[in-house]
Regions:
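Active-site-adjacent structural elements in enzyme catalytic cores
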Residues: 1-118
């Protein structure tokens, strides 16, 4: 999975990015999520962890980070345990904010015109 951060324009509602000047787009690698997106269109939602905390590896791990019960589909087999790579393309040069499943080398191989910060 890959999350791409871009500069937000005036078409991005305040409630989507809390008024920040950037917005993130996550490209999932999950059959059920891709099917849902195909049927309903784009989805908007936060990460399933508290900012700065490690991502849960099981639904119960995710639920334990929050102080209330969370509705959801418990499908622990679908969790890979590997976070998405966060690629920031909002500046002059690309930056990887979090290394995940997709490496900088793979990005450069597939899209050689992307220039990274040193």
């Amino acid at each position: 999975p890959l999350t791409i951060i871009l500069k937000a324009n005036d078409n991005v509602p305040f409630w989507v990015n809390s008024g920040l000047d950037t917005v993130g787009f996550r490209v999932p690698n999950h059959v059920k999520t891709l099917q849902l997106i195909s049927e309903t269109g784009p989805l908007i939602g936060p990460s399933a962890n508290i900012s700065g905390n490690e991502s849960g590896k099981k639904f119960s791990d995710i639920q334990a980070q929050f102080s209330v019960d969370l509705p959801g589909i418990e499908d622990d087999q679908a969790l890979t345990g590997i976070d998405s790579t966060i690629l920031d393309l909002s500046g002059q040069k690309a930056r990887i904010l979090r290394q995940g499943a997709i490496s900088r080398e793979l990005i450069q191989k597939e899209i050689p015109e992307i220039e990274f910060e040193d």
